[in-house]
Amino acid sequence: MEQDFSMHANPLVAKLQKPASEFTKADIVSYIKENGITMVNFMYPAADGRLKTLNFVINDAAYLDAILTCGERVDGSSLFPFIEAGSSDLYVIPRFCTAFIDPFAEQPTLSMLCSFFNKDGEPLESSPEHTLRKACRAFTEVTGMEFQAMGELEYYVISEDSGMFPATDQRGYHESAPYAKFNEFRTECMAYIAQAGGQIKYGHSEVGNFTLDGKIYEQNEIEFLPVRAEQAADQLMIAKWIIRNLAYQYGYDITFAPKITAGKAGSGLHIHMRIMKDGKNQMLKDGVLSETARKAIAGMMELAPSITAFGNTNPTSYFRLVPHQEAPTNICWGDRNRSVLVRVPLGWSAKTDMCMIANPLEAPSNYDTTQKQTVEMRSPDGSADLYQLIAGLAVACRCGFEMPDALEIADKTYVNVNIHKKENEDKLKQLAQLPDSCVASADCLEKQRAAFEKYNVFSPAMIDGIISKLRAYEDRTLRSEVQDSPEEMLKLVEKYFHCGQRTEQIL
């Protein structure tokens, strides 16, 4: 059956009538010619977590072909601090499947994400994007299956408080206007992200909602659909860029920071995963969680301490990961349980046709709901290195298939109660805890680095660089030192307010 792309949000997909994964150079050239595109942007993440941009004016057809084919040189030492200036040249080559129209450019502009290559024309081994590609390849080689992921992107919008229709403090979940003030901003972000190729599930206001010093702080979330893991990281990267740019146009401030004030909800970056084979979701069997899913979970239980090195990368991360909040602190998993590290959310496994019940005029749908089941890692936050985090999760899930006692570990770490309630103290004492600082996270990565370096997924130099950066924070006792000092906490929040993907490492 021929696929209909006419309603696709990405105008390139709608025009070319093919999925972005099938875009060729000829497609890009054709679209540029037929749609009056005058500029091309190459974009790529650097060490500070922000997308960098290289602008090209389309001089003529020959020049367009040259830049699409050959890419361009960039100074790697200015992008990644651990590349030596004496041998710093890198190539950036556009990936056609990431092409989108820049919604903020005054000139008609087509943008693409790029891959880094070294002087020998080989993929840069320690580039975040290539590391994720290697992690996914190793997962498939070991399991014969495909690793997919998607993110829940939480952020705060900050603006002047009008005082009208005040929302209830810390009760902003799924709130509507006029109590939620930034619904229109969020939906405009969603439209731009979708036009740039992001596969969005939905958006909504989140729990966090408060006023401070005449400003309103409103937490929002945009959640994506599961896609290939490489695409999942790309769309999160572009989404953060779009949200920040649109906020700038509106005069708002935006933060993805894990914690912005004591006693208020912090922002996480929960990552959902599913495992596919021949286009079918392998997370369920006969309506219950499959052995495949439980092995993947066991791998995450095993490597959870070191995954924080990729997903919780600055000191304020560990002010979010505290007991008795929705953010996890213990290494365990469970069904529909928000006190656990890995949660198995509702997966439409009930044997009823809810659509027909709600809409009696509808015929039975026979919709395959098994495709919807995921598992969710709840520890990461907005400081995460997006590519390294998802690569680390792919490694952890792969390890679950290599561990002979994986199913035993899954059984041992399963909980079906709120572990923070007093009556469950004994169960809580049996569970290992996540690191409580960047330094502790670095120690865990040092101990478990072999799993990440296996199959040459993470290079030893990359792991060394991550460990060095985390230890440089010297925050082993910071949480206890500042917990009773609002002034010191505020200084930390301000320092890491614009945190993002961190890729500072030895390359």
Where are these regions (language model features)?
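Glycine-rich, acidic/polar active-site loops that bind/position phosphate-bearing ligands
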Residues: E2-L507
